[in-house]
Amino acid sequence: MSGLTHFDASGHAHMVDVGGKQETQRIAIARGTIRMLPATFALIRDGKAKKGDVLGVARIAAIQGAKRTADLIPLCHPLALTRVAVDFELDDALPGVHCVVQVETFGRTGVEMEALTAVQVGLLTVYDMCKAVDRGMVITDVSVREKRGGKSGDWKAEDTAG
């Protein structure tokens, strides 16, 4: 692994110059989970949450999160995203919800941060919409699962658990 790219020779933070990089298709997939009480899970599953369609609102929030990443993470480049796909998987065994986001662009830098931000914002929205009945929900295991494109090539998480 190379050194930290967001610091110059003097140790000052800077936005990485991607001007000389090749434009390629960039894809990143991130995943995260929110664990909750069985009663909270049932409200989401059955569509009975007082604030409405929890996963529908969380899907829109995740998409917005991906689009606004450069506004939130200081050294991220603003990107023209070509696709943001959000999937929620209900898991009775936890109980909880998994959020999987795939982000794509055609550009000079990757979209891992956009995918991670989207997952976090989606799961935070689930928390926000359900906190009145379950303040003990836990957001966990947020990670990049796969990235494709760019100079460093393709990468996939070694574990297959998520």
UniProtKB/Swiss-Prot annotation:
Keywords: Lyase, Molybdenum cofactor biosynthesis. Substrate binds at L75, C76, H77, M113, E114. InterPro entries: MoaC, MoaC_bact/euk, MoaC_sf, MoCo_biosynth_MoaA/MoaC, Mopterin_CF_biosynth-C_dom. CDD domains: MoaC_PE. SUPFAM superfamilies: Molybdenum cofactor biosynthesis protein C, MoaC. The keyword Transcription regulation does not apply. Pfam families: MoaC. Its EC number is 4.6.1.17. It catalyses: (8S)-3',8-cyclo-7,8-dihydroguanosine 5'-triphosphate = cyclic pyranopterin phosphate + diphosphate. PANTHER family: CYCLIC PYRANOPTERIN MONOPHOSPHATE SYNTHASE, MOLYBDOPTERIN COFACTOR SYNTHESIS PROTEIN A. Homohexamer; trimer of dimers. This is Cyclic pyranopterin monophosphate synthase. It comes from Burkholderia lata (strain ATCC 17760 / DSM 23089 / LMG 22485 / NCIMB 9086 / R18194 / 383).
